Amino acid sequence: MALLMPRPSEQTPWVQRRGQCGTWGPEYAQLHDDVLSGRTREQYLVVEGIEGLADSLSLIAGMLYVAVLSGRALQIRENVPYSVAYDKPNIDWRETSKSRTMTEQHFTLRTGGPLPFDEPAFRLIYNGSIEELGAGADIVTMFGNVGVINVLFNNPVYKVQLYKMGLRPETAYGCALEYLFTPSLSVKEHFRDEIITMTGSSMKIGIQVRLGDSYLRGGVFEEQKHADASLLAVQHFFECAEQLQAAFRQPGQNVVWLLISDSLDIRSLSKTEYGDKLLVKLDEPSHVAGMTGHEQNQAMIAAAGEHWLFGLADYHVISSIGGFGRSAALRAQTWNTVYKLDVYQTNLLQCDGLKMKPLTWDDIANTAPFV
């Protein structure tokens, strides 16, 4: 039977989670404040994520540790409105204006396939020295969609430092997101009922059905939108949830399922089928990067809220494609709780938690867009 790692209360301040996330947080917050206030040399690591929210969060989470290890203040370039969806519990990560006399170097960590070993920044993080990243420049700007946490934990030097900081590969991603972000008031208001349910004592199973960006409003391939999605084609995701429920539910425990999907049809059909047992928003899913203005703000609130809620689940049934479900599940800081299924591959219906092997950290982290 899969073992759950004890999860700290969502209301517990990060500084009190030292048994799970280490003790480095307050010290880095002081360094960050010293840099921003000019009390120490101004050295910044500015991060600009691309593609979808999950890709960007993967880059941002890894770059937090690069900033910690190199003594730079992390800042996030808001090419999408992070501040609309997230508050800043420990450091103010918003990008600030810089003096024109400051030196700057730009790097790219971008991929749509294998890890970008040919990128200079990746090579330094993988088996070199982070201190050489930027070669003393005041500002290092990192642009991309690739996470480097797993890479850092494979670097013979930095993995030792990360372990001494109290971090582990299985928890580092979730710890980074919790350090940087808490849901904004707008997110909490939009998902008020869902938050109450997902922070209760019920057994919570998250289900992510990803069909592709063509189903998203504002998605890259929206003009190629497929025919209406059929619930029958993805029924094995819900059968998997039923099997996990049968295997791990405690006697008398209530069960709730949380569904996130890029298909409005799947959301609507599933709600009709499963009723009150299923938590699901019936707003049309939108691609954050494909929207502008007020519509982009609303898309960001929806995406960030569902990503955060999914991390509250005890077990996660995710699609094999894309990074949204995987990265949201990693926020939970648990292991042996993530089960991957292929969309439309209905001949593989077994998801019995006692028989089917859950994903390991490496399974999750070493699949594009990586963590």
What would you call each of these model-derived segments?
Residues 3-235, 241-242, 246-255:
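Secretory-pathway glycan-assembly enzymes, especially type II membrane glycosyltransferases
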Residues 56, 60, 266-268, 325-326:
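Short, well-ordered alpha-helical microsegments
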Residues 61, 303-349:
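A donor-sugar binding/catalytic signature common to diverse glycosyltransferases
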Residues 78, 209, 259-261, 317-318:
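Short beta-strand/turn micro-motifs composed of small residues
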Residues 82-85, 263-270:
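Short, charged/polar "capping" segments at the starts of alpha-helices
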Residues 276-284, 336-343:
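Short hydrophobic/aromatic-enriched beta-strand-loop microsegments
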Residues 277-313:
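Donor nucleotide-activated moiety binding/catalytic core segment of transferases
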Residues 343-371:
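Leloir-type glycosyltransferase catalytic cores
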